[in-house]
Amino acid sequence: TTAVKDGDGWVLNGSKMFITHGTSAHTLVVMAVTDKSKGPKGISAFILERGMPGLLAGKKENKLGMRASETAEVIFQNCRVPASHLIGEEGQGFLQTLQVLDAGRIGIAAIGVGLAQGAYEAAERYTAERHQFGRAIGSLPAIRERLNQHASAVEACRLLTYRAAWLKDQGR
């Protein structure tokens, strides 16, 4: 996606794929190349609002899971954006993206910890209910060892996630 200065604003052209809430979001933050010669320092961030001329919703993806939010293509066809919708200064978009990703990765880690905790709890229930050789398989040393390793790994991941969040809060 490119953004070209035009009078008192910008004109965006291009498209973005796999955008969460691409067909329903009222406000979008869009990264666009404003100066190709500067590489990553030539990317800028813009705020776009649904209904702006030239801002179009493209194909909605038929996803296997995570259907609570739609994922779709967003298309920009000579989409005029006021200069006041530039976030920060021209060329800061790549750095802004990295800062957002840093925080987002902590959230993704937390989701992973929750999923791992749920899997561990399901395994605990199953090994308590499933009987073999006249007793619950959860009482067998080999099964107990694997469950203990899983519990330790989940707790290690939880603590690493907490530490990452704490470091982010400390500005590190």
Predicted regions: what is each one?
Residues 52-156:
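Glycine-rich beta->alpha junctions and the first turn(s) of the following alpha-helix
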